[in-house]
Design a protein with these regions (language model features):
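Short polar catalytic/cofactor-binding loops
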Residues: 10-15
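CN hydrolase (nitrilase-like) catalytic-core segments centered on the catalytic cysteine
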Residues: 63-82, 149-232
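Cys-nucleophile CN-hydrolase/nitrilase-fold catalytic domain and related Cys-dependent amidase chemistry
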Residues: 18, 22-104, 173-192
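Short hydrophobic-aromatic micro-motifs
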Residues: 40, 139-144, 165-167
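Conserved hydrophobic/aromatic positions in well-ordered beta-strands
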Residues: 7, 100-102, 109, 213, ...
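C-terminal beta-strand edge segments of enzyme domains
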Residues: 132-134, 199-271
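Extreme N-terminal starter segment of soluble prokaryotic enzymes
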Residues: 1-8
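Active-site catalytic loop in hydrolytic enzyme cores
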Residues: 90-160, 173-175, 179-181, 238-255
C-alpha cells in the first residue's frame, strides 16, 4: 500500500513581488521533493500576497507564464503542488481567489474560494470550489481560508469522500485559537484529517501566526510549526498512523533550486 507524504509550505512572502515569490516557491518545492513529498500545499494567495485593494492589478489568467517554472518542477518531481493567486476570469469584473493545482502530468486545475470574508466582496468574486484530488489513495478536498468558516463546506467535503481536508489560509495570532479549534473539530466530527498551510510572515497588513498544522482523523494534532517564519511541515502515514516533522528556514541553508527546462505556457494542458 502506498504511503502518502503531504506537506504544508509555510512561506514568508513579499506582497506584490511575483518574481521573488516564485523563487521562494521553487525553493520550498525542491526541498519538499527531496523529502519525497507527493502533495505540497501553499497558503492563500501565496504568489502575490493578500492585497485585496490591488488584486485586480495582480490578477493572473489561467495560462499565466508565471506558473511555467513551478509546473516544470512539479512535473519533474512528480509532486502535486497547490499555489494561491488572484485569478482573472473572463466575463467577471473582479478576480477570484484561486488555489491552482500543478499536476505531475503538467496539467493545471483550479479551485476557487466559495465563501468570502466580510469586505472581500468589494475586490473579489465568489468562486465555485473544485474537484477532489487523489494522492496515494487519499482523497484530498481543498479549502481556501473563509471556506472553512462555513461548516457546510467541510461537511460537503466529507460527504464527497475526502480523507484529507487541505486548507490554504491566512490566520493572524488573535484568530488562531478560534480557527484552529474549528479545523480540529472538523477532523474529529467527520473522521477526516486536516492539513492547514498558513502564511509565515506579514501580508496585506496582517501579521500571520504561522503555526501550520495537521490533525488526524481523531482530531489529534500530529505536528505543527512553531510560530511564524519559513517552515516546511511534512506529514506521512504509515502502519501506525500519521506522523510529522517541521523543518525550519529554507534560506540561506537550503540550496538554490536546479530548474528543469521550462516549456512554453501554451504547451501545458490547462483544464
Amino acid at each position: 500500500m502506498p504511503i502518502p507524504v503531504l506537506a504544508a509550505a509555510q512561506c514568508a512572502i513579499r506582497d506584490g513581488d511575483l518574481e521573488g515569490n516564485v523563487a521562494l516557491h521553487l525553493q520550498f518545492m525542491q526541498r519538499a521533493a527531496e523529502l519525497g513529498v507527493e502533495l505540497l500545499l501553499f497558503p492563500e494567495l501565496s504568489l502575490t500576497g493578500y492585497e485585496p485593494s490591488i488584486a485586480s492589478a495582480l490578477a493572473l489568467p489561467r495560462a499565466t507564464p508565471l506558473l511555467a517554472p513551478l509546473q516544470a518542477l512539479a512535473q519533474q518531481a512528480g509532486m502535486t503542488t497547490i499555489v494561491g493567486l488572484p485569478l482573472r476570469v473572463p466575463g467577471r469584473a473582479k478576480p477570484q481567489i484561486a488555489a491552482c493545482t500543478l499536476h505531475p502530468d503538467g496539467a493545471v486545475t483550479t479551485y476557487t474560494k466559495q465563501y468570502l470574508h466580510a469586505g472581500e466582496e468589494q475586490f473579489f468574486s465568489a468562486g465555485s470550489g473544485g474537484e477532489l484530488l487523489s494522492i496515494s489513495g487519499q482523497a484530498i478536498a481543498l479549502s481556501v481560508c473563509a471556506d472553512f468558516a462555513e461548516p457546510e463546506h467541510a461537511a460537503n467535503a466529507a460527504s464527497a469522500g475526502a480523507d484529507v481536508y487541505a486548507a490554504s489560509v491566512l490566520i493572524g495570532e488573535p484568530g488562531y485559537p478560534h480557527d484552529s479549534v474549528i479545523l480540529q473539530g472538523y477532523a474529529q466530527q467527520h473522521g477526516m484529517a486536516v492539513l492547514m498551510a498558513n502564511h509565515g510572515g506579514p501580508t496585506g497588513g496582517w501579521a500571520a501566526a504561522g503555526r501550520s498544522a495537521f490533525w488526524d482523523e481523531l482530531g489529534q494534532c500530529v505536528a505543527s510549526t512553531e510560530g511564524a517564519g519559513n517552515r516546511l511541515l511534512v506529514i506521512s502515514r504509515g502502519l501506525k498512523g500519521w506522523s510529522g516533522v517541521s523543518i525550519s528556514e529554507p534560506d540561506p541553508g537550503w540550496p538554490a533550486p536546479q530548474l528543469p527546462q521550462v516549456r512554453s505556457a501554451q504547451s501545458v494542458e490547462n483544464r
